[in-house]
Amino acid sequence: MAQLEGYYFSAALSCTFLVSCLLFSAFSRALREPYMDEIFHLPQAQRYCEGRFSLSQWDPMITTLPGLYLVSVGVVKPASWLLGWSEHVICSIGVLRFVNLLFSVGNFYLLYLLFRKVQPRNKASSSIQRILSTLTLAVFPTLYFFNFLYYTEAGSVFFTLFAYLMCLYGNHRTSALLGFCGFMFRQTNIIWAAFCAGHLIAQKCSEAWKIELQKKKEERLAPTKGPLSELRRVLQFLLVYAMSLKNLRMLFLLTWPYVLLLLAFFAFVVVNGGIVVGDRSSHEACLHFPQLFYFFSFTAFFSFPHLLSLTKVKTFLSLVWKRRVQFSVVTLVSILLVWKFTYVHKYLLADNRHYTFYVWKRVFQRHEVVKYLLVPAYIFAGWAIADSLKAKSIFWNLMFFVCLVASTVPQKLLEFRYFILPYIIYRLNIPLPPISRLVCELGCYTVVNFVTFYIFLNKTFQWPNSQDIQRFMW
């Protein structure tokens, strides 16, 4: 059975890579020059490729650290020595873009290993389910598209998933080192390095919580009723747990590689004067709480085979009626957050090359009241996401929610790329869905990818004040 699964995996990976190579060829023919953010990334990588590493050679418009460029040089330079290619060829746009295609192969393999590790292997979860889940996430539209451009997404996901895998296998020093590599691609990836530490802490808290529950059971204390009472008990338990020096010492000994990484990050922020390098004018942090609601909607859209069903809607409505006071409070708080904390970035309104421009224009700008009318849908999506993660411990859920808030809420710009990593972490940790739902999900992703690539490659346009060809993209 294991050998057969290996054949299935090899076939899925080979077919995906073949299709990706064909798409890469189409991209290379259509895009001879750097496009969008590539106008910053590609020249910087080419300077590194030529051995010009001094700070005077750094483009101040770049806001991320040089992880992508350093890895690219580490890949293409040995290739030039082995193949005898000239520097002009090895540092070309096509070769540098191909580095991300290599990252996509690594991501496919890491996703498969993560599904094998995260999901319990039993008769109920077949090899087909694991491989279909891997294939589906590997072609997740928002991530898959950027495998063909010289962006940081593919490498960022690779090192973050690798760090998560090493964490699950208990190799925490390697995990922290890989977390640092992820940070070098995108500074906010430090949150997902902290997530690995949080995973360890959640495990230990769960063990202690089980002992606590067993004591309560033996003392025959009345069980708590309702989620708020349960949450209050959990928070009280965490407070008591954190007050114990013995527990803190044990947690530090477990998580010290991540603690060192976080201390290095804080030192970087102090020395740099902020998390962003280069141009900070367009990357101002703020409390943009509706980003959580946008993530819930994004997740509900891309995971609709698992989150949307008539049964789920009926269950949700029944729960709303049963706990109408609590849901009324949640609704009022959500409306308040939408009212007071909605921010509209200048790029969202000005750049009509991104899909988010049209989502905002045709949904949110249709009428002032629309953003409030969507609140019930946000609440349903949030509940459906939480319900799909109920197999995980409450401590894991708390830790994931904290990391989700930290990675999305400070972002002023509505950008689907910011949702890639939290979505993948979420999708990895829900129970393996039935094959029929996975096939439906894969089919929908394939359609979305086809439409996205077709529009990007064929439906070009020009701005009135520019002769450059513009394209629609995520």
Curated annotation (Swiss-Prot):
Q: Which residues lie on this side of the membrane: Cytoplasmic?
A: 1-6, 86-97, 148-150, 197-256, 305-317, 387-392, 458-473
> Which one Pfam family would you cite for this protein?
DIE2_ALG10
The record gives the membrane topology as:
Multi-pass membrane protein
Q: Which GO terms describe its biological process?
A: auditory receptor cell development; dolichol-linked oligosaccharide biosynthetic process; potassium ion transmembrane transport; protein N-linked glycosylation; sensory perception of sound
Query: Where is this chain's protein located in or outside the cell?
Result: Endoplasmic reticulum membrane
EC code: 2.4.1.256
Question: Does Transmembrane helix show up as a keyword for this record?
Answer: yes
Cite the entry's keywords alphabetically.
Endoplasmic reticulum, Glycosyltransferase, Membrane, Transferase, Transmembrane, Transmembrane helix
Q: Can you tell me where the transmembrane regions are?
A: 7-27, 65-85, 98-118, 127-147, 151-171, 176-196, 257-277, 284-304, 318-338, 366-386, 393-413, 437-457
Q: In which pathway does it act?
A: Protein modification; protein glycosylation
Known catalysed reaction(s)?
an alpha-D-Glc-(1->3)-alpha-D-Glc-(1->3)-alpha-D-Man-(1->2)-alpha-D-Man-(1->2)-alpha-D-Man-(1->3)-[alpha-D-Man-(1->2)-alpha-D-Man-(1->3)-[alpha-D-Man-(1->2)-alpha-D-Man-(1->6)]-alpha-D-Man-(1->6)]-beta-D-Man-(1->4)-beta-D-GlcNAc-(1->4)-alpha-D-GlcNAc-diphospho-di-trans,poly-cis-dolichol + a di-trans,poly-cis-dolichyl beta-D-glucosyl phosphate = a alpha-D-Glc-(1->2)-alpha-D-Glc-(1->3)-alpha-D-Glc-(1->3)-alpha-D-Man-(1->2)-alpha-D-Man-(1->2)-alpha-D-Man-(1->3)-[alpha-D-Man-(1->2)-alpha-D-Man-(1->3)-[alpha-D-Man-(1->2)-alpha-D-Man-(1->6)]-alpha-D-Man-(1->6)]-beta-D-Man-(1->4)-beta-D-GlcNAc-(1->4)-alpha-D-GlcNAc-diphospho-di-trans,poly-cis-dolichol + a di-trans,poly-cis-dolichyl phosphate + H(+)
**Would the keyword Nucleotide-binding turn up in this protein's UniProt record?**
no
A GO cellular component annotated for this chain's UniProt record is: endoplasmic reticulum membrane
PANTHER family recorded for this chain? ALPHA-1,2-GLUCOSYLTRANSFERASE ALG10, DOL-P-GLC:GLC(2)MAN(9)GLCNAC(2)-PP-DOL ALPHA-1,2-GLUCOSYLTRANSFERASE-RELATED
Per the record, the similarity remark reads: Belongs to the ALG10 glucosyltransferase family.
Record's function text: Dol-P-Glc:Glc(2)Man(9)GlcNAc(2)-PP-Dol alpha-1,2-glucosyltransferase that operates in the biosynthetic pathway of dolichol-linked oligosaccharides, the glycan precursors employed in protein asparagine (N)-glycosylation. The assembly of dolichol-linked oligosaccharides begins on the cytosolic side of the endoplasmic reticulum membrane and finishes in its lumen. The sequential addition of sugars to dolichol pyrophosphate produces dolichol-linked oligosaccharides containing fourteen sugars, including two GlcNAcs, nine mannoses and three glucoses.
Q: How does it assemble?
A: Interacts with KCNH1; may regulate KCNH1, possibly by regulating its N-glycosylation. Interacts with KCNH2; may reduce KCNH2 sensitivity to classic proarrhythmic drug blockade, possibly by regulating its N-glycosylation.
Q: What is this protein called?
A: Dol-P-Glc:Glc(2)Man(9)GlcNAc(2)-PP-Dol alpha-1,2-glucosyltransferase
Gene designation: Alg10b
